[in-house]
UniProtKB/Swiss-Prot annotation:
Pfam families: KRAB (PF01352), zf-C2H2 (PF00096), zf-met (PF12874). The record marks R178 as: Crucial for 5-methylcytosine recognition. Keywords: Developmental protein, DNA-binding, Metal-binding, Nucleus, Repeat, Repressor, Transcription, Transcription regulation, Zinc, Zinc-finger. Residues 57-77, 194-226, 372-406 are annotated as: Disordered. One of its GO terms (molecular function) is double-stranded methylated DNA binding. GO terms for biological process: autosome genomic imprinting; epigenetic programing of female pronucleus; epigenetic programming in the zygotic pronuclei; genomic imprinting; negative regulation of gene expression via chromosomal CpG island methylation; negative regulation of transcription by RNA polymerase II. Residues 17-88 form the KRAB domain. Expressed in oligodendrocytes and at lower levels in astrocytes. This is Zinc finger protein 57. It comes from Rattus norvegicus (Rat). Transcription regulator required to maintain maternal and paternal gene imprinting, a process by which gene expression is restricted in a parent of origin-specific manner by epigenetic modification of genomic DNA and chromatin, including DNA methylation. Acts by controlling DNA methylation during the earliest multicellular stages of development at multiple imprinting control regions (ICRs). Acts together with ZNF445. Required for the establishment of maternal methylation imprints at SNRPN locus. Acts as a transcriptional repressor in Schwann cells. Residues 395-406 have a biased composition (Acidic residues). GO terms for cellular component: heterochromatin; nucleus.
Length: 406
């Protein structure tokens, strides 16, 4: 009996101690209740325990070598870099887990693969079974599209896309942007542009020009007094032999078409009887109706049921949250938000700005400002017409008096 007890005690001593047995783990709710000093103390204690475990593992006795597993041991020794020598640990401040490398902590906080699967394959098991870690890191979300952000500045910048608010403008071309970073990115386009050559042609009479190096220039524009050249838009090549090249008749015909005034005909909008999406062309409506005919009548209209990328692209819809009008493109939705309708006095983006709390002025003040501006314009136009009227009548009276005297 004593021998059996000794064998049991020896087995109990030989059992390995894991990190999970020694470590103390807190739940998310318990971790939130801890103070900053308690969190730092917990990190220090856990780092010390981890170092002690690695030290004990390095001091273990080596096992007896097995001749059958020599090759495998050699491969392991070549791949293994050694025992962790102890260094700075990386702790997650939200759940308290520690990691050896910063990359492990980053993958723990921001799992990239699950996000890609959720976008590319939304019905896959990995994407459906995945639960996003640390939701508290992105508490700010948009009520319209559901996008989440870490801080309020990112959410306000995203709201400008819905409202169409672009306060920053380019000093070179006058284009408007949402923030200064987009303006700085746009200014690089102006910096990379090469300076346009002048209209005059520089002729180097003294310097000889090689046959392989040809300098190109343009003929100076003609004035009213100077005679016009025989060919339009000559392209002169300076060198040992001067040649003139005229552009083809096709290019000139294209110029005439571009300069001619085109009258835009109003197109009748056609809407889908199933989902009430409006289209300007009937062919687009017919292509859209194929999606409804493919599916069964009891199924709902959803992007998940389509099988190809073209059908997904056609089913992508942008809805206006104010007037419930749907569009296929993002630009058309922004144009609709910024345009003013004759039925409504205000634009859709103004109403949306008040709903989101972006514009602080009430709609009544905006209407008053518009009415005052209209009245001022009417007064200015009436004053200008009155000033022009009496001057014209005086001239007529003077002409009549001159005719009477004659």
């Amino acid at each position: 009996m004593a021998a059996k007890k000794q064998s049991k005690s020896a087995k109990a001593l030989r059992t390995t101690v894991r990190y999970e047995d020694v470590a103390v783990s807190f739940t998310q709710e318990e971790w939130e209740y801890l103070t900053s000093t308690q969190k730092t103390l917990y990190q220090k204690v856990m780092s010390e325990t981890f170092k002690n475990l690695t030290f004990v593992e390095s001091k273990k006795k080596p096992q007896e070598p097995n001749p059958n597993l020599k090759d495998k041991d050699d491969d392991k020794s070549s791949t293994c870099t050694g025992v962790f020598k102890g260094g700075p640990f990386f702790f997650c401040l939200t759940c308290g887990k520690c990691f050896k490398k910063n990359t492990f902590l980053f993958n723990h906080q921001f799992p990239v693969r699950s996000r890609r699967l959720a976008v590319t394959k939304p019905q896959s098991r990995k994407a459906l079974g995945h639960k996003p870690q640390h939701r508290g890191d992105r508490p700010f979300f948009c009520n319209l599209c559901g996008k989440t952000y870490r801080d309020a500045s990112g959410l306000s910048r995203h709201r400008r896309a819905h409202v169409g608010y672009r306060p920053r403008s380019c000093p070179e071309c006058g284009k408007c942007f949402r923030d200064q970073s987009e303006v700085n990115r746009h200014l690089k386009v102006h910096q990379n542009k090469k300076p346009v050559a002048g209209s005059h042609v520089k002729v180097h009479q003294n310097k000889p020009v090689a046959s392989n190096q040809k300098q190109k220039g343009r003929v100076p524009p003609t004035t009213r007094e100077s005679p016009a050249p025989a060919l339009r838009h000559l392209k002169v090549i300076q060198g040992p032999v001067a040649r003139a090249k005229a552009r083809s008749s096709r290019a000139s015909s294209l110029e005439v078409r571009s300069t001619s005034v085109t009258v835009a005909r109003p197109r009748e909008k056609v809407y889908c009887p199933y989902c009430r999406i409006t289209f300007t062309m009937r062919t687009c409506l017919l292509n859209h109706l194929k999606i409804h005919f493919r599916r069964q009548p009891n199924q709902h209209f959803c992007c998940k049921e389509s099988h190809s990328s073209n059908t997904l692209r056609m089913q992508k819809i942008y809805n206006c949250p104010v007037c419930d009008s749907s569009f296929r493109g993002k630009e058309s939705l922004l144009n609709h938000l910024c345009s003013r309708r004759p039925i409504r006095l205000s634009k859709c983006w103004e109403i949306l700005g008040h709903l989101l709390g972006y514009l602080r002025e009430p709609l009544g003040n905006i209407f008053k400002v518009r009415e005052s501006r209209k009245r001022r314009r009417k007064r200015i136009s009436s004053d200008s017409s009155e000033t022009e009227g009496p001057s014209g009548s005086d001239e007529v009276m003077e002409v009549d008096t001159d005719s009477d005297l004659s």
